[in-house]
Amino acid sequence: MLNPAFVIHSRPYRETSQLVEVFTQDSGRFTLVARGSRGPRSPLKGLLQPFTLLTLSWRGKGDLKNLAQVECPDHSLRLGGDRLFYGLYLNELVYYLLEAHTPFPEVFDAYARALMALADGETPELPLRRFEFLLLQALGYAVDFEYAADDDSPIQPELLYGFERELGFVACERAPDPRTLFLGAHLLAFAEGRFDTPPLLQAAKRFSRLALQPYLGKRQLKSRELFLKRRSSLG
């Protein structure tokens, strides 16, 4: 049975093979051995690329399984310029944050939608924020954007709220770190899944970084590093 999948990462293995990290719709993220895939006559040569929706099957009983069959029903999504780094960022989130061999079908679908939006020229910040928010939900991190964490009072649009990761949002006028302050109107928009203005997108980005940081720990995302290097080289 063939399963929809994306390649998240790959690296050489032995003389002509690859270790391929895949994200599948029904079985989650795991590593496959693609035997002989780097050989000069391999039908897999050039096929196991990121940002391409594949269908594949595997065999084996251990954690490290062998790629059995792969088909490419669709063309690769073209991510050029900065959008390539946004795609790599999505891949790193999947690779680092999703537990291996655990199905996350809703994350898979959101990942596919985000890639298509990037390839179609949509404003990058929008699909990235949508994906991050859904990913946080899938990881079990649920924050209430409608009620204050300290007294369960309804969030007021005109008030400022400080973000405390273990609690949620608490009304306050100032905080030691201004990055943790959010306007109530923005929180209510998040509750509705709205990121339709530049200020909302900026606030959503701040929240995502704060909420995802404990999951990422001290890892330095390569996509972010490469993105900054590209921007620096372009002046």
Language-model regions, residue ranges each:
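Non-catalytic alpha-helical scaffolds and adjoining flexible linkers that form interface surfaces
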Residues: 1-18, 23-235
